[in-house]
């Protein structure tokens, strides 16, 4: 029995019969495209190249293989052209839907200024040069207008993808490039829409009056589409979104109505046969003025983008390769190469000149604005389509059109390298120092910023200073920082003219309650500084006077400026007379959380139950029992580094308690699937770092009869971890733990955070600070410096402009 699939698409001439080799070859072409595409993109991923580059390379090769070209000749080429046109309609619709036309009605922002300036300089330069190079013999000035507009535009989807892939979209330059690219793309495509109305690509009508009425008809249809879409679509889509809330399946009838509505607004300007309005540009206009917020719009964007990226774009570039036909490429055509280098130079020079001039007015660095200009030269699929269409309609020679497409693709090829150069320069200009105890150079002084909410923190602050110093060489600097909320009453008492001991020397605080509080704290910490004078201890006073909204930012800025290794903050809850903790201060809790998230160094939160009331560690004969719990992970390693500072003090009796997971237990075996889901390489690297760090500590402070004692506990699950923590109840005055609560793969803490009251303390710290734990044991929860972002040596939101 013959397996024959018959589909009549073009009269009686196209029948897809898989029994015939030339028919099966069509299927083989598409399979080859998708397979080779995946492999080639994987190989080019280290270069940061987007799919457009690999798709073009594959399409150019496969589209020029004679057997493949023969399989798609004749009526099949018509079908392929129809597929490409439909795909471009979808591409332009979703591109418009992702844009926001309301920015055109607002005062121009920096990105708009850069977009306008770079567009104008490139357009003027291109329009001055292109008419003399004779790209086409039909309507040369109209073609020069279109080519100049293409040269001045930007392919925002490709540019945004390159910026996101190389992880600079949160930086100031990344944000500016993305916004300016979208603005440029939107303006240039709208100008294409207007240009098509007055200069249609179809054969012009003989009489000027007829041409005028056709242009008037298309303009009226354009205005009707914009008006109808802007007014009706928000009402309709808001109703659909309200009827289909998040979390519930989309109703089929509403989905069908929404798609029908989209098809209606995209197509109705093309209904009158006299209009000849371009359906691709009509789809862009419809998408542009549709609301892009809401569930239905997001659903449409996601689905269409998925189909475009996985199915359409590979076929599109096969069509482009088919159109180019390298056999017709005349490499000896000198004039074509003059056009090539002239247009490439015009695109680069125009964009770079415009952005540099605008950047100078805005106060940006020239190298960065030049890089921004190079990024804005990036073109996209729409520009490739226009160039290929010019070849197909014989408006340009095949060689000239192919070289224009090569220029478009070349602007995409070098964009990732421009971004890499930006990152390289940012690393030099914006170095990020690793400020953590674990990597502290032993030959440098220890710098610690200690926050105080009031006089009740004096005792714990002095004890922290003492145990951290421990006779350390070359010494320690402690920045005792008062964290004071800036209320309206306090703001009314501020006077210009700095006061001594304040971090902000532009004002003096005259509020009586604040000055009395600061005087009592200053007397205590200065007294300790005088006591340790000559022993390498330096105490300095700081003030963070801010609202709770900005206090975390000020403290982090102070820590960065002072280059401290760790910030130690008081817990937001205070000790009651009965030994319990009160409900806490919501403002200081907010500050602690923000500092944990944004601090440039390590952070410790001190839960003071009795630490500030115990015998001062510097008194003769004083003794203080301190324990550190080590499970594993970066925070536990930082806690161990803090314990190493504490271990030097003669009055401290330090005990290291290491919780080890029993690998032979059934629980550990069940968790192997979790390890498989997580990055096994990362987990093994973490375990290696833990073992190396602990071995170094053990050899230095525990082995050979050191003063630090050691205990291991082999546990199987979080329940046994909780029991082990309860067994420490009341034995130590201070317990040091890492906020992370061990490695992500550790089963010893899994489940402990299900009922967390204070997530900022981590699973172990939250248990130890609970109301059912000892009222005599204080906790210090430590978090190692978080290097935000995925760029090595840089934060995601680095600033370089």
UniProtKB/Swiss-Prot annotation:
Q: Tell me which UniProt keywords the record has, alphabetically.
A: Antiport, Ion transport, Membrane, Potassium, Potassium transport, Transmembrane, Transmembrane helix, Transport
**Spans traversing the lipid bilayer:** 24-44, 77-97, 113-133, 140-160, 179-199, 216-236, 252-272, 275-292, 304-324, 343-363, 371-391, 403-423
Tell whether ATP-binding is among the UniProt keywords.
no
Listed GO biological process terms: potassium ion transport; proton transmembrane transport
Is Metal-binding one of the keywords?
A: no
> In which tissues has expression of this protein been reported?
Specifically expressed in pollen.
Q: Which Pfam families match?
A: CHX17_2nd, CHX17_C, Na_H_Exchanger
Q: Which InterPro entries match?
A: Cation/H_exchanger_TM (IPR006153), CPA2_transporter (IPR050794), Na+/solute_symporter_sf (IPR038770)
Q: How does this protein lie in the membrane?
A: Multi-pass membrane protein
A GO CC annotation recorded here is: membrane
| Domain of life (superkingdom) | Eukaryota
Location(s) in or outside the cell: Membrane
List the GO molecular function terms.
antiporter activity
- Sum up the protein's function in the record's words: May operate as a cation/H(+) antiporter.
Record family assignment: Belongs to the monovalent cation:proton antiporter 2 (CPA2) transporter (TC 2.A.37) family. CHX (TC 2.A.37.4) subfamily.
What protein name is recorded for this chain? Answer: Cation/H(+) antiporter 28
The source organism is Arabidopsis thaliana
């Amino acid at each position: 029995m013959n397996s024959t699939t018959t589909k009549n698409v073009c009269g009686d001439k196209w029948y897809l019969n898989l029994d015939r080799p030339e028919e099966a070859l069509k299927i083989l072409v598409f399979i080859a495209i998708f397979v080779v595409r995946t492999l080639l993109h994987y190989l080019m991923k280290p270069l940061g190249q987007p799919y457009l580059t690999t798709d073009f390379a594959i399409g150019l090769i496969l589209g020029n293989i004679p057997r493949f070209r023969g399989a798609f000749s004749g009526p099949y080429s018509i079908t392929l052209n129809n597929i490409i046109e439909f795909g471009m309609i979808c591409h332009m619709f979703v591109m418009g839907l992702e844009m926001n036309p309301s920015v055109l009605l607002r005062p121009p922002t920096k990105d708009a200024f850069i977009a306008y300036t770079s567009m104008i300089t490139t357009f003027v330069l291109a329009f001055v040069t292109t008419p003399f190079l004779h790209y086409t013999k039909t309507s040369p000035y109209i073609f020069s207008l279109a080519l100049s507009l293409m040269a001045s535009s930007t392919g925002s989807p490709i540019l945004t993808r390159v910026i996101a892939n190389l992880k600079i979209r949160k930086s100031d330059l990344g944000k500016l490039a993305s916004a300016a690219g979208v603005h440029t793309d939107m303006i240039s495509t709208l100008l294409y829409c207007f240009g098509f109305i007055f200069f249609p690509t179809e054969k012009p009508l003989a009489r000027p009056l007829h041409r005028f009425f056709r242009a008037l008809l298309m303009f009226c249809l354009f205005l009707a589409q914009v008006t109808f879409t802007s007014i009706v679509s928000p009402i309709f889509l808001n109703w659909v979104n309200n009827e289909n809330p998040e979390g519930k399946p989309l109703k089929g009838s509403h989905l069908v109505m929404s798609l029908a509505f989209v098809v209606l607004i995209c197509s109705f300007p093309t209904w009158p046969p006299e209009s000849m309005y371009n359906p691709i540009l009509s789809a862009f206009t419809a998408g542009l003025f549709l609301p892009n917020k809401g569930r239905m719009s997001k659903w449409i964007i996601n689905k269409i983008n998925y189909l475009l990226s996985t199915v359409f774009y590979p076929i599109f570039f096969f069509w482009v390769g088919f159109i180019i036909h390298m056999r017709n490429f005349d490499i000896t055509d000198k004039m074509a190469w003059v056009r090539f280098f002239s247009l490439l130079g015009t695109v680069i020079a125009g964009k770079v000149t415009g952005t540099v001039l605008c950047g100078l007015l805005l106060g940006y660095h020239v190298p960065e604005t030049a890089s921004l200009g190079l990024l804005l030269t990036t073109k996209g699929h729409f520009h490739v389509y226009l160039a290929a269409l010019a070849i197909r309609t014989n408006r340009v020679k095949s060689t000239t059109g192919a070289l224009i497409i090569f220029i478009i693709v070349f602007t995409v090829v070098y964009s990732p390298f421009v971004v890499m150069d930006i990152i390289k320069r940012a690393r030099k200009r914006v170095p990020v120092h690793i400020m953590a105890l674990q990597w502290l150079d032993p030959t440098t002084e220890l710098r610690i910023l200690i926050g105080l909410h009031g006089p009740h923190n004096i005792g714990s602050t002095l004890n922290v200073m003492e145990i951290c110093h421990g006779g350390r060489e070359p010494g320690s600097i402690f920045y005792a920082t008062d964290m004071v909320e800036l209320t309206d009453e306090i703001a009314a008492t501020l006077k210009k003219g700095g006061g001594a001991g304040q971090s902000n020397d532009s004002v003096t605080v005259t509020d009586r309650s604040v000055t009395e509080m600061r005087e009592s704290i200053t007397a205590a910490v200065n007294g300790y500084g005088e006591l340790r004078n000559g022993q390498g201890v330096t105490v300095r006073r700081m003030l963070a006077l801010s609202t709770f909204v900005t206090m975390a930012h000020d403290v982090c800025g102070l820590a960065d400026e002072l280059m401290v290794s760790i910030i130690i903050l008081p817990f937001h809850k205070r000790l009651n007379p009965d030994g319990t903790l009160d409900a806490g201060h919501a403002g200081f809790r907010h500050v602690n959380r923000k500092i944990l998230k944004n601090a440039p160094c390590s952070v410790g939160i001190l839960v003071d139950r009795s630490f500030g009331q115990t015998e001062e560690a510097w008194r003769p004969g004083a003794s203080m029992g301190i324990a550190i719990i080590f499970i594993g992970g970066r925070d536990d390693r930082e806690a161990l580094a803090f314990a190493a500072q504490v271990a030097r003090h003669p009055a401290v009796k330090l005990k290291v308690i290491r919780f080890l997971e029993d690998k032979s237990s059934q629980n550990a075996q069940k968790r192997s699937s979790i390890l498989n889901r997580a990055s096994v390489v990362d987990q093994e690297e973490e375990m290696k770092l833990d073992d190396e760090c602990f071995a170094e500590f053990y050899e230095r402070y525990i082995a050979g009869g050191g003063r630090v004692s050691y205990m291991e506990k082999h546990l199987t699950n979080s329940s046994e971890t909780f029991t082990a923590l309860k067994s420490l109840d009341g034995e130590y005055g201070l317990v040091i733990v890492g906020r992370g609560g061990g490695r992500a793969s550790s089963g010893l803490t899994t489940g402990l955070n299900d009922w967390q009251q204070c997530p900022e303390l981590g699973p172990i710290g939250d248990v130890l600070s609970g109301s059912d734990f000892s009222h005599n044991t204080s906790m210090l929860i430590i978090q190692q410096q978080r290097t935000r972002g995925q760029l090595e040596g840089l934060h995601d939101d680095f600033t370089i402009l």
